[in-house]
Amino acid sequence: MNTTRICTLFCLASLFAPAFFCAPLLAQATAPTSPAAATSATPAATWPTDEADLNALATKLVNGWFQQIADKDMKGVMAAMQPNFQVVTFQGVFDPATSMAHVSNLGTKAPAVSKVIATRVGDALVVTCLVKADQEMDGKKLSSDAMPRLGVWQIVDGAWKMAAWASLSTPSPRPAPKAPAFAGDAALNAQGAAMLTKLLMAQHKKELPAFDAMLATGLQIVNFKGQLGRDDMMNGAKRATTDLPMLADTRATKCGDLLVVTCNLTMGQKVAFTTIPADPAPFLAVFQGSGDAAKVIAIANTNKPK
């Protein structure tokens, strides 16, 4: 699998505020004064300069996120989210307010992050990884295997903030998703539904040039196969046969130049000997830009073969 990674110049700046005190030449000695206390400030978030540093940054962000969850640091968890953040899980879609109970109830213990892959797409940091953790929901144990996750970050007010998150950790069998507990903006929801429908219909109709044009360089995907990139997406579109996509409970939110679109998607697929059922499943797509120039930078599909 080839995953395109885009990196730009990076500077880690440390701010110092030294104070210097000078006495005039030949001045009479005076009682010693206490040195001025140095002031410190958290360096503003900046972009790494190479692939290794980009992955290191992504690893730090994901580990920090899961440590806050494991510590039940709900204040820290909330602070890491942008106001219009959305998260997709097997249960459905959540915004910052409605996600707090979900995150707390998971009872996350001993999270272990691996296989971190980071790409830069414009001002967005797209990250996929595998996470192994002890979690449960409604008394049901989630998979104890290392499962795919996807996150999208942006720099907001000098700090890395999450625009979207998706988890593919589920109990078996996967239950039917619930409708989101938040309504969102009707106009944005309609816009998001139209953009996602356009993408999925191009795949369904095998309009491959049009489909290809909607995929950003640096796109990352998580699905039942694991972590995928743009080339994998195109290869899958060529080989797969998909049912007519049906979107329900669509929610769309703006984070800078990103449109985070979620829904419960019903779209069966067949690829070689693998069949994905036409069951509703939470789905996430993050678009960058607007109109015909918009491109998808991140996709998470929680559906899987039975």
What feature does the model see in each segment?
Residues 34, 126, 146-176, 280-306:
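Short beta-strand edge/turn micro-motifs at domain boundaries
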Residues 75-112, 212-246:
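Short solvent-exposed beta->alpha transition segments
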Residues 9-24:
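Bacterial N-terminal signal peptides
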Residues 29-83, 169-213, 217, 254:
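Short, low-complexity N-terminal intrinsically disordered segments enriched in polar/charged residues
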Residues 65, 77, 85, 99, ...:
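Hydrophobic pocket/interface hotspot
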Residues 1-5:
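Positively charged n-region of N-terminal signal peptides that target proteins for export
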Residues 81, 91-92, 117-122, 129-133, ...:
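A mature extracytoplasmic/lumenal domain signature
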Residues 100-143, 235-277:
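Surface-exposed, charged secondary-structure patches
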